[in-house]
Amino acid sequence: MVTVTINGEKREYAQGTTYEAIAAEYQKDYEGMIALVAVNGKIRELFKKVTKDCLLEFFTLGDDVGHKTYVRTATMLFLKGICDVFGAEAARKSCVEFTIGHGLYVNTLGMAPVTAQSAEKIKARMLELVENKVPFMKRSYPLEEAMELFREKEMQDKEKLFHYRMSSLVNIYEIDGYYDYYYGYMLPNAGYVKWFDVMPYEEGFMLLLPSKKNPTALEPFDERRKLFETMESSQDWGRKAGIETVGDLNDQICSGSMSDLILIQEAEQERKIGEIAKDILDRGNVKFIMIAGPSSSGKTSFSHRLSIQLRTMGKTPHPIALDDYFVNREQTPRDEKGDYNFECLGAIDVKQFNDDMVKLLSGERVELPTFNFKTGQREYRGNYKQLAADDILVIEGIHGLNPEMSYALPEESKYKIYISALTALNVDNHNRIPTTDGRLLRRMVRDARTRGSSAQRTIQMWPSVRRGEEENIFPFQEEADAMFNSAQIFELAVLKTFAEPLLFQIPKDVPEYYEAKRLLKFLDYFLSVPSESLPNNSICREFVGGSCFNV
């Protein structure tokens, strides 16, 4: 017998008892379905067995690592469904691209008819596997053997990925004869995937899954058309460039052609910024450019580059930060924990902002405020503005797309831009890179360089940042007149050099270690690219340093 400690309670179990069996006894104490377990601080899948005295901590679908496990498992189940309904080639070539709302978009690239009937067939096969609780089997293969397995199955994307792996073993999952590789943990069997739906969408299917906030129910699909088109455009650019996966990128690095790739991508981004500037001019009456996006999107560099484009077209842009319209500290709303909530709309003096902007629009001379972050007070320091015929205001802040932020301004006077780092690169066809991972790594590298902040601190506060984005930015994405994707297909290979030493500093006995370990494993797929190759106006420079802009 072995002694297991859970939530301060000690119990004895026979050696060889699965963590799944132990979790079943404790499930009643947890609101969400248990998905994983930490054994003496190390995450383990539930099918593993207890072998000695240990301390256990369970993770549910409401935890980040548990929710990721559910999504990963449902993805493999979905691809198994495609394999059984439309054949192995259809599953092999299908690409898991990105999320829209709580839907995971899988592009079948013409390998399956995109119809409601097809979606029902895939779903029906998935439900069969769920009902029969078909297990996900995990096996460690020697690296060369794993490469040979995927070579036989014509999964060149995975074979290429493993070519650059340093580890000697690779974990491969199998369900009912279908083999695949995933970078992360899985649930024990298909019976755990209780909440999902499948619908046809564009060139593939949308796999609808529950959110971390509401993990036991499906929410209606929130179609975000502009966001989809922006992300799919970036995916298409990667396909045309021949860089769809990390293996493709590593091939480019080894071929010595990275300098060309960097210049091509930078030129592509500059072209898109120029198109946005031209659209602004073509509208004729725009006086206020409202720029918003989530943390570490590169808003500041983008604003500078857009301003340069506008200058080439005869406009005189003036930057304004919505942060300067913060209410005085004592008036700032507090969150449910009693802490100041600087990210809600109530933290901004919306009325004063609108009053000032309306006066500027009518040609008046206005003294604009400056917020003193040390004293927590708004100050007036003689910063007067008066708009001439060719003047235009570039306004940056998280609430820029919210109609309430600029309620008094005529719609024709505003041009709204949504910017985010929408990673188009995949690890391989079936392992996408969440856009939040790229932004988290950007934030980590920048905060360490400019604020002396540790990676542990950045990871610790990231959930709070994400909640603010979900509440204040993402609901207004589709209000944008233009969307700009600031992600660069090579940037994770550049960030790797800066991020890895920061992540290795995180001790093993803190909660943030789990996320640090995941990110280190993720970065291990990439070869490094030196930052010296980046031009000094690159958006990536905002994070790694060396920008010609005041960022």
Residue locations for each model-derived region?
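Hydrophobic positions on the alpha1 helix immediately C-terminal to the Walker A/P-loop
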Residues: 302, 306
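Hydrophobic anchor at the beta1->P-loop junction of P-loop NTPases
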Residues: 289-291
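Glycine-rich phosphate-binding loop used to anchor ATP phosphates in small-molecule kinases
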Residues: 354-412, 462-476
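Short beta-strand-centered segment that lines the nucleotide-binding/catalytic pocket of NTP-utilizing
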Residues: 312-330
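Conserved lysine of the Walker
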Residues: 299
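Conserved NTP phosphate-binding and transfer environment spanning the P-loop NTPase/kinase superfamily
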Residues: 284, 407-551
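Conserved nucleotide-sensing/catalytic segment adjacent to the nucleotide-binding pocket
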Residues: 327, 331-374
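Auxiliary tRNA-acceptor-end handling modules of aminoacyl-tRNA synthetases
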Residues: 48-69, 81, 86-101, 105-271, ...
